[in-house]
């Protein structure tokens, strides 16, 4: 295929091994790679934007090697993509990749994910965009994941990938030889038991540290083929999960299932 102009971002920051592996994998295939990502880790920031302080950027080419132009940005992952598209890039990219995330982005957790938010910002701007994660916080071999991600992205581009559709890719944390297959999946609904650890700082003031434990993974009830596996079950079986996600969150159920609307309070008689 002809070389693509690819923008890469993440939420783990400019020093993360995952984003370097992804950028190198794209470059090896002859694509033109630009990186705009947070200057430090900003995981779980969702689709937040910076409104009360200026955004600052610094060149970071030396972290990625020859041929890759890179910037570290003081903002969120969504800030990075928005700023790249508006100010930093000379041309609109053909493809936006976010990752490789150090840890999973499965099910309803994607609402908290900065990785997914960076890709979603691209989707909102009608650029084909994919979020990429390795489903383990301890896994360090990102080279194989980078190759898998590029294979999938190139195939999707060749197959006329709808720019309004975000692809969320999760790769199991195992050697490539042990990965079984790739399948389309549905988002699961993840339920957590939230735990806050109460601590005391050196000045005697209390603070809280959030932790959480997954207690339930439910298959979503959304529209789509009912025989699709959930993304969580796919990863548990050492299979690659690819989930199509739309930015339109509008509910498409039956009107009769909604609460009744009473207009009497607007102009009471």
Swiss-Prot record:
InterPro entries: SurE (IPR030048), SurE-like_Pase/nucleotidase (IPR002828), SurE-like_sf (IPR036523). The keyword Metal-binding applies. A divalent metal cation binds at residues 11-12, 43, 101. This is 5'-nucleotidase SurE. Its EC number is 3.1.3.5. It catalyses: a ribonucleoside 5'-phosphate + H2O = a ribonucleoside + phosphate. Belongs to the SurE nucleotidase family. Keywords: Cytoplasm, Hydrolase, Metal-binding, Nucleotide-binding. Its cofactor is a divalent metal cation. Nucleotidase that shows phosphatase activity on nucleoside 5'-monophosphates. GO terms for molecular function: 3'-nucleotidase activity; 5'-nucleotidase activity; exopolyphosphatase activity; metal ion binding; nucleotide binding. It is found in: Cytoplasm. It comes from Prochlorococcus marinus (strain AS9601). GO terms for cellular component: cytoplasm. It is an enzyme of class 3 (hydrolase). The lineage of its organism: Bacteria, Bacillati, Cyanobacteriota, Cyanophyceae, Synechococcales. Binds 1 divalent metal cation per subunit. Its main location: cytoplasm.
